[in-house]
Amino acid sequence: MAAEGWIWRWGWGRRCLGRPGLLGPGPGPTTPLFLLLLLGSVTADITDGNSEHLKREHSLIKPYQGVGSSSMPLWDFQGSTMLTSQYVRLTPDERSKEGSIWNHQPCFLKDWEMHVHFKVHGTGKKNLHGDGIALWYTRDRLVPGPVFGSKDNFHGLAIFLDTYPNDETTERVFPYISVMVNNGSLSYDHSKDGRWTELAGCTADFRNRDHDTFLAVRYSRGRLTVMTDLEDKNEWKNCIDITGVRLPTGYYFGASAGTGDLSDNHDIISMKLFQLMVEHTPDEESIDWTKIEPSVNFLKSPKDNVDDPTGNFRSGPLTGWRVFLLLLCALLGIVVCAVVGAVVFQKRQERNKRFY
């Protein structure tokens, strides 16, 4: 894992232990804690290395139990999934494989943070590999389907780690991470790489890395944040940050992967869930969180992502038709100013002629 140290970015921290020659007590799990003071005066929601908030009933951690069998405590396998002593392989580097792993226990935490240690690798060259991994927090589990090995029209949250661009017209650079929230009414469109239903996303070069790769998902008080550590720097990098997300409690965590004509090894090394200690208002506490319908309060439609290669419609750069409209407005403004200037100039000329 990456070197030990505190990395503060967007209120996040991760302590990774165990490399020789570094300070620290040795290997240990990454876990969250809220610090009220940082350097004497900074207040923030920050995770640290204290394991008291790790929820083991929702976590997949080495050493795995049940190696060599078709099941393990707290987790169910499906499809091509294979358990080894070092990783859970969702699919091998073979065509037409689907596999998934799902937690037994529904999660009733209102605020949580999931750290995923994963690896996607294979022999395929550029754009000759696929398809990717999906991380799930959904109502239904162990239902195979066409969306990275799991069902379409799901209820809940999905984070897609997509390695292959099916849409040949896309401007985006793959691998690409995107987020989708669904109440069962939306279908994931593989031909467009899910762009029509994507809330936000980012390019993330996680395939065939020679070091560990991590992804973190935080959900707290309606804010969904996804961050990555892919550069072996022990540093979280912001990928997705969305507010107005509503997710119920009582759903299941899982991971799935699928291959088609192209393939890769899709491995999960660990999934660690942490409880975030967050105060809620009396009104929030009185809500039956199991009855909440998955939804997002949009500033704009996710379809606005179509011409935005970053996928982040809230803060992405101006591209495509947005640039065209901006230039058109500027041109019209110049024309109007020129016409008004010409009229004013002509009237001044006529007024000057009256004095001669």
Curated annotation (Swiss-Prot):
Membrane topology label: Single-pass type I membrane protein; Single-pass membrane protein
Topology, Lumenal side: 45-322
Main localization category: endoplasmic reticulum
Cofactor annotation: Ca(2+)
Record's signal peptide: 1-44
Tissue note: Ubiquitous.
Subcellular location: Endoplasmic reticulum-Golgi intermediate compartment membrane; Golgi apparatus membrane; Endoplasmic reticulum membrane
The L-type lectin-like domain, residue ranges: 52-276
Positions bound to a carbohydrate: S96, D131, Y164, P165, N166, H190, G260, D261, L262
Binding-site positions, Ca(2+): D162, Y164, N166, D193
Keyword Transferase: no
Cystine pairings recorded for this chain: C202-C239
Top-rank lineage group of the source organism: Eukaryota
Spans traversing the lipid bilayer: 323-345
All ranges on the Cytoplasmic side of the membrane: 346-356
GO biological processes: endoplasmic reticulum to Golgi vesicle-mediated transport; positive regulation of phagocytosis; protein transport; retrograde vesicle-mediated transport, Golgi to endoplasmic reticulum
Protein's job: Plays a role as an intracellular lectin in the early secretory pathway. Interacts with N-acetyl-D-galactosamine and high-mannose type glycans and may also bind to O-linked glycans. Involved in the transport and sorting of glycoproteins carrying high mannose-type glycans.
Cofactor binding comment, as recorded: Binds 2 calcium ions per subunit.
Protein name stated in the entry: Vesicular integral-membrane protein VIP36
Record keywords, A-Z: Calcium, Disulfide bond, Endoplasmic reticulum, Glycoprotein, Golgi apparatus, Lectin, Membrane, Metal-binding, Protein transport, Signal, Transmembrane, Transmembrane helix, Transport
Molecular-function GO term, any one: carbohydrate binding
Glycan-bearing residues: N183
GO cellular component, one term: Golgi membrane
The keyword Protein biosynthesis is assigned to this record: no
